[in-house]
């Protein structure tokens, strides 16, 4: 049987429990717009669906969460691992736990199997990513994850 080889998303050999800041993007399955919608007046903000509210609840429990935005079909977040003690989990453990908790409460698998990560290397990069997260709703229609199909699927 020929199996499709999945692309390795993590940096090979990197310890994702190391102190540092990580920029994470999690997409919904099939990039469906089920987490909310972007309002246009007077300022672009995300209006969360019931699923988005559940995701928000569990995001707020992530230790080291510095900034985040829930978009209609994806979530961006900055997570800081700041301690060498055993109470901090690795990034893969944090993301897995988050996805499991949301899935259990929603009742179906919300997110794609994997996620995108970027190790933040310096303060300048940190500030640039922070700004990107904050401005994401304003630039929704320019976003690479923008999906007109099923514009407000969560209302169906």
Predicted ranges, named:
Residues 1-156:
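Short catalytic/metal-binding and nucleic-acid-binding patches
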